Amino acid sequence: MTFYDHTAIEPKWQAFWADNHTFKTGTDASKPKFYALDMFPYPSGAGLHVGHPEGYTATDILSRFKRAQGHNVLHPMGWDAFGLPAEQYAMDTGNDPAEFTAENIANFKRQINALGFSYDWDREVNTTDPNYYKWTQWIFTELYEKGLAYEAEVPVNWVEELGTAIANEEVLPDGTSERGGYPVVRKPMRQWMLKITAYAERLLEDLEEVDWPESIKDMQRNWIGKSTGANVTFKVKDTDKDFTVFTTRPDTLFGATYAVLAPEHALVDAITTADQAEAVADYKRQASLKSDLARTDLAKEKTGVWTGSYAINPVNGNEMPVWIADYVLASYGTGAIMAVPAHDERDWEFAKQFNLDIIPVLEGGNVEEAAFTEDGLHINSDFLDGLDKASAIAKMVEWLEAEGVGNEKVTYRLRDWLFSRQRYWGEPIPIIHWEDGTSTAVPESELPLVLPVTKDIRPSGTGESPLANVTDWLEVTREDGVKGRRETNTMPQWAGSSWYYLRYIDPHNTEKLADEELLKQWLPVDIYVGGAEHAVLHLLYARFWHKVLYDLGVVPTKEPFQKLFNQGMILGTSYRDSRGALVATDKVEKRDGSFFHVETGEELEQAPAKMSKSLKNVVNPDDVVEQYGADTLRVYEMFMGPLDASIAWSEEGLEGSRKFLDRVYRLITTKEITEENSGALDKVYNETVKAVTEQVDQMKFNTAIAQLMVFVNAANKEDKLFSDYAKGFVQLIAPFAPHLGEELWQALTASGESISYVPWPSYDKSKLVENDVEIVVQIKGKVKAKLVVAKDLSREELQEVALANEKVQAEIAGKDIIKVIAVPNKLVNIVIK
């Protein structure tokens, strides 16, 4: 039996592509463009795992498909190479993070090239290259000049173990850090902020213009969190102080029985009475140790302290005790709420716990038992009584505005983006703080502000980054003799990844971020493939920067990514015990088709789980490429199931994909190829061209491969294979298995040219229709024969053919035919006696 040798074929074609710059981006202005973008990886020390190539293979298939369809294709790759892991490694080992990163990139690039992806490596970018981050810094200076980058004393999410503050988006639901899982505490610090809130409405509205999964759009909508309601001003009794509350339900103001301020609210100390001062100070201290997520957890026990003061409800003059509680955040809304315990679960629980008044203002429910959170007509509400929700809100807003104690208001949950990190391994923020109290941006002519090389990269612990220790870099003097210090904070990893897709378009430009004409030619990105875990962070930040650049006239489109696709996760083989705990694969043995714990003998259930070192179920693509070949890995990952589904890795599935490719190789290299078309494969070939073309376009790669298998099965039944169909089939499979595609193309054509730019095959619609049809012949209602006849024969012709059939003649010999019923294209029924 013939098998192909992937160890010879794959390196041969990889060298051919590299030597001939086969995948250099096309520049023919008469052709349509296609920009296929992968989320570029962070080059970790662990290298690629088999999850990475799933998305990369999808964009590669599309890129090869579009090249063959006559498009200029931009399909680049680069490295998101700043970030904490390299710095952590450097601190642990004493090595330079730049050297460590360069080694990791070389390893990633080797692995990626071994998988046969058609990247244009002339466009490679690296976020740690000063020629790249010059423009990251330039974007920052533009944000600064526009007032969109500013310094503020803000409570930050401080992670002691990392020695840095992190953004809200980087705090996990359990209140630990996304990176490392460390405890997060709130701590006030001077920080750089980016005013993403100025773009909240546009970030929301323009989601309508992009072809993204609805689930991702919803995550962004929820994160932006637009609310329409009213601001209401409450005066503090016996003082000249007041505070503002934002509420989406101003119609329930008659039911507000107490107010709650965030412990950090500026008014707290001023209105706290002497009797309550100690309790309030204690409570504030405890609250500062909790993350926002821990504080707002709905399930946690309600805690709070009364300030000793009262607010006056503006609508009825009632006195409302003012409390502080950690479930109210200073960073959200106004940092103060009016509590309507009859109609809000959290307020109800708080009121019950601290014995506060509960006054129902909506009809329905029993507020002694539980908060009534549905809609109802208004009661106990004076001029709102009997009104429904919408009418009551409108009337109350009108009253508030007329009385000068409130106004209609739109708010957003979105907070400004905490942009500074107290770390070494990041882009220096190009700002100088002068001793006269002013700050200026480093001028463009002096960019890039290069990150200095230093051995001392441990966090200072003072809230400054290790750059504070590099004196000769840190201290500067102006021409007029005024001394200054450079900003010591660095940018977060999100900075370089917020605009990298623009640099691929013009990666070697030293004068500007990218040429305007090239940006017009290539934007927006046509397809962006990556994990759904980036729904809020990266995708929101990139959209924000893109909109700023649009306002600056740098980019011609409002949105960066026209279509987004999230590939699923490839899960590892793993096992669970009876308690549901996962068991590492090296603790499992297989006996008689079942799985058992080596140490306890307990029978285990096979259960796919995320690949992890601890479960010892991480699959290294290097091993797969060595044993089965890159084409097998590519075909297997595309054939596993729908691209957006999470599916378990299977060695059997991998072997099945390899067997299929061996069958393809045998079909083309051992079957007699002929210039004469017998017509036997007309229908299946044309169906295959049509199906694969449509399914690749729709990213339904698994069904495209299934159709290729149908063709192979049909072709194997024939003695000879028509040359045009052999070539067309090889073109169809080449985007999935490019090395094999090139090898078989040469076997058929000996052209010496790559298959990459050979025009994509077309199909003949007329061949999709069967000219013959199978009919059944029934005698006495039982099927006696099946006949293949020309389509659309008349009743008379059908009757003739049926009666002339040998089997039928044997059945009716010596019998009287009473009648013959012929139904064209279906059946002939013969009645005899």
Swiss-Prot record:
Keyword terms of this UniProt record: Aminoacyl-tRNA synthetase, ATP-binding, Cytoplasm, Ligase, Nucleotide-binding, Protein biosynthesis
Molecular function as annotated in GO: aminoacyl-tRNA deacylase activity; ATP binding; leucine-tRNA ligase activity
SUPFAM superfamilies (UniProt xref): Anticodon-binding domain of a subclass of class I aminoacyl-tRNA synthetases, Nucleotidylyl transferase, ValRS/IleRS/LeuRS editing domain
Gene it is expressed from: leuS
Keyword Nucleotide-binding included in the entry's annotation: yes
Record's protein name: Leucine--tRNA ligase
GO cellular component: cytosol
Top-level taxon in the UniProt lineage: Bacteria
InterPro entries in the cross-refs: aa-tRNA-synth_I_CS, aa-tRNA-synth_Ia, Leu-tRNA-ligase, Leu_tRNA-synth_edit, M/V/L/I-tRNA-synth_anticd-bd, Methionyl/Leucyl_tRNA_Synth, Rossmann-like_a/b/a_fold, tRNAsynth_Ia_anticodon-bd
Extent of motif 'KMSKS' region: 610-614
Source organism of this protein record: Streptococcus pyogenes serotype M49 (strain NZ131)
EC number: 6.1.1.4
HAMAP family in UniProt: Leu_tRNA_synth_B
